[in-house]
């Protein structure tokens, strides 16, 4: 069985990352890809389901998992809550031939690259700063103060785009989705991937 690929997908809030990932999964008819479900110590928000949106655990449980080296990466964010990516769940999916997406920021991406040099990373950029702000306002979810803070954070996040393997500019959603699909397909056609996944065939072809 072919092994899945591990992908990091990062973007400033409002760039369309979550929508692109959701659309990609909807078009996946073979269950060949999934999003890693993070662990967190924060309380569930209305409509969130344990095991679907996050694995909700106590601080004590999370810190126990840290001691057990259960996370590929984790962070303690503003407000004191932990977020972490489970190593076991990722490995199970990759071994089953499933591509796994990590929806994380550039700081988490740095942690993972140090541990997993095989990871592929994609950064989603907005077509302009004004378009990003317009999308955040159009959501109708945040106050002007929160939007201002998100915009300030976005400038910092965007400055790290060149740490990634691929960049997609989400000016047109459908085209950005096609670009994302092409990246996934291309990664399964690299020489290194084919040498690993089709070693027996290549050996047979080279036998004189």
Swiss-Prot record:
Domain annotation Guanylate kinase-like: ranges: 4-185
Subcellular location: Cytoplasm
Entry annotated with the keyword Nucleotide-binding: yes
Amino-acid positions noted as binding ATP in the UniProt annotation, renumbered to this chain: 11-18
Pfam families named in the record: Guanylate_kin
InterPro entries in alphabetical order: GK/Ca_channel_bsu, Guanylate_kin-like_dom, Guanylate_kinase, Guanylate_kinase_CS, P-loop_NTPase
Keywords linked to the UniProt accession: ATP-binding, Cytoplasm, Kinase, Nucleotide-binding, Transferase
Reactions accelerated catalytically: GMP + ATP = GDP + ADP
Molecular functions (GO terms): ATP binding; guanylate kinase activity
Enzyme class: transferase
EC number from the UniProt entry: 2.7.4.8
Superkingdom per UniProt: Bacteria
GO CC annotations, alphabetized: cytosol
HAMAP family tied to this protein: Guanylate_kinase (MF_00328)
Family of this protein: Belongs to the guanylate kinase family.
NCBIfam families linked: guanyl_kin (TIGR03263)
Function recorded in the entry: Essential for recycling GMP and indirectly, cGMP.
Protein name per its UniProtKB record: Guanylate kinase
Organism: Histophilus somni (strain 129Pt)
């Amino acid at each position: 069985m072919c092994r899945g690929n591990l992908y990091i997908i990062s973007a400033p809030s409002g760039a369309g990352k979550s929508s692109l990932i959701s659309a990609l999964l909807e078009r996946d008819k073979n269950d060949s890809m999934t999003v890693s479900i993070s662990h967190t110590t924060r309380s569930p928000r209305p409509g969130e389901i344990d095991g679907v949106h996050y694995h909700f655990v106590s601080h004590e449980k999370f810190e126990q998992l840290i001691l057990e080296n259960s996370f590929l990466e984790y962070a303690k964010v503003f407000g004191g809550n932990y977020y972490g990516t489970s190593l076991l769940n990722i490995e199970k999916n990759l071994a089953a031939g499933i591509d796994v997406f990590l929806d994380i920021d550039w700081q988490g991406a740095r942690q993972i690259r140090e541990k997993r040099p095989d990871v592929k990373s994609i950064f989603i950029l907005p077509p302009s700063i004004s378009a990003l702000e317009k999308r955040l306002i159009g959501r109708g979810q945040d106050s002007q103060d929160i939007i201002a803070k998100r915009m300030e954070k976005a400038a910092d996040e965007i400055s790290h785009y060149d740490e990634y393997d691929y960049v997609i500019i989400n000016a047109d959603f459908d085209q950005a989705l096609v670009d994302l699909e092409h990246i996934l397909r291309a990664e399964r056609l690299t020489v290194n991937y084919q040498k690993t996944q089709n070693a027996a065939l290549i050996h047979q072809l080279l036998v004189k």
